[in-house]
Design a protein with these regions (language model features):
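Charge-enriched, short contiguous segments at helix-coil
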Residues: 95-159
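Amphipathic alpha-helical interface elements
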Residues: 2-95
Length: 159
């Protein structure tokens, strides 16, 4: 890779690198706690399972509307979720839909599962991991209800 002329002065480069190291170390330290690491992995795994399940439904829904796309290209819009679930005959209550697919709760800026996943992917600080620990069971319960609803529909549709 060709070496471009730096846009920062040497002391600014050093300060920027030091800031990056500090933030990387904060993430490492936050995830060094075994319980925080377990919560993180449990949540990320279940959210990923829910997301691929939902995006599979969304992909078919979009194709039925004449919009060809792939799962990788899909964006989740919370206001679209009830329509997609109805299309696939998946029964999930409004609170679970909000808990899984909204980014934040109203003006509180408290993370819902999708927002939590985003912040965990970009900067899982101790503060965020503490919020996850407090809300993990709510997230996991809502996600499990979606997973079960999709599984139940798959079984009833084939019987």
């Amino acid at each position: 890779m060709p070496k471009a002329k730096p846009a920062l002065l040497p002391e600014e480069q050093k300060a920027l690198a030091a800031e990056a190291v500090k933030r990387m170390n904060e993430v490492r330290q936050a995830l060094a706690n075994p319980q925080a690491r377990e919560d993180y992995l449990d949540f990320i795994i279940d959210f990923t399972v829910c997301e691929i399940g939902y995006k599979t439904l969304l992909e078919r829904y979009m194709k039925s509307r004449g919009r060809a796309c792939t799962v990788e290209d899909l964006t989740i819009y919370p206001n679209q979720v009830p329509h997609v679930l109805k299309y696939a005959d998946i029964d999930l209550d409004e609170d679970d839909i909000k808990t899984i697919f909204n980014k934040y709760v109203g003006k509180t800026r408290k993370h819902e599962a999708r927002g939590m996943r985003n912040v965990l992917a970009h900067e899982p600080t101790s503060k965020v991991l503490n919020e996850l620990a407090k809300r993990k069971q709510d997230y996991m319960d809502a996600m499990q209800r979606l997973i079960s609803a999709i599984n139940n529909e798959a079984q009833t549709s084939t019987n």
